[in-house]
Amino acid sequence: MPAPVLSGPQYLREGLKLVLSPGLRLFVLLPLAINLVLFVGLIYFAGHQFSLWVDALMPSLPSWLSFLSYVIWPLFVVLVAFMVFFSFTMLANIIAAPFNGFLSEKVETVVRGTDDFPPFSWGELIAMIPRTLAREMRKLGYFLPRAIGLFILSLIPVVNLIAAPLWLLFGIWMMAIQYIDYPADNHKMSWQDMLAWLRQKRWQSLGFGGIVYLALLIPLVNILMMPAAVAGATLFWVRERGVENLPAK
């Protein structure tokens, strides 16, 4: 077994291999399609509204400011690009939460050798929605006060020198929580017990959270890395819990 902090890349690599397998592909493609349709729709709506706003604004400006129409649109495109980049992961995780819990459950079925082609059930998926969304709100409640505290810290001269590394460490820790919580929640482990278990596996958790954090920073690639992280986190759960002695692949 590799050193604890170095096991993260292995889990993510195996998770990616799992979600690309024929038996699990459907559980990945459906939430990806929903997220892509949603974002395309939001971008189209924003572009349409912005176009109406520009058309209404430009006639009221002096003629010598007409060049602004050529400046405003590129700025809008850049703004939308930044918004998509920074909001996609957060919004996609909330939308995909029931799918991710469902995917984690099916990955565990495959990993334990119960069924290489687990069946897809809409009824089973819908039944998971209230629980998984409540858990996402719990994560948000954990994240926000700490993020606000770090933001305030970053505004204090001199002290803010430690804010950047703390932000990075907190982001890595949140990635571990975000994804390992799916299999933990499937096994009805309480929020506090899950956090306590991750602290016991601190270095393994940070290693996994770190590689996921880096992978999700890559535009477009992060779309596939989210389900891969769910599968990798499920492998993390099964192996680190020691319920079964599953060999590394």
UniProtKB/Swiss-Prot annotation:
Domain of life: Bacteria
Cysteine pairings via disulfide bonds: none
GO cellular component, one term: plasma membrane
Keyword field contains tRNA processing: no
Membrane topology: Multi-pass membrane protein
Entry's family note: Belongs to the CysZ family.
Function, as annotated: High affinity, high specificity proton-dependent sulfate transporter, which mediates sulfate uptake. Provides the sulfur source for the cysteine synthesis pathway.
TM helices/strands, residue ranges: 26-46, 71-91, 150-170, 206-226
Organism: Pseudomonas fluorescens (strain ATCC BAA-477 / NRRL B-23932 / Pf-5)
Stored Pfam families: EI24
Protein name according to UniProt: Sulfate transporter CysZ
UniProt-recorded Gene Ontology molecular function terms: high-affinity sulfate:proton symporter activity
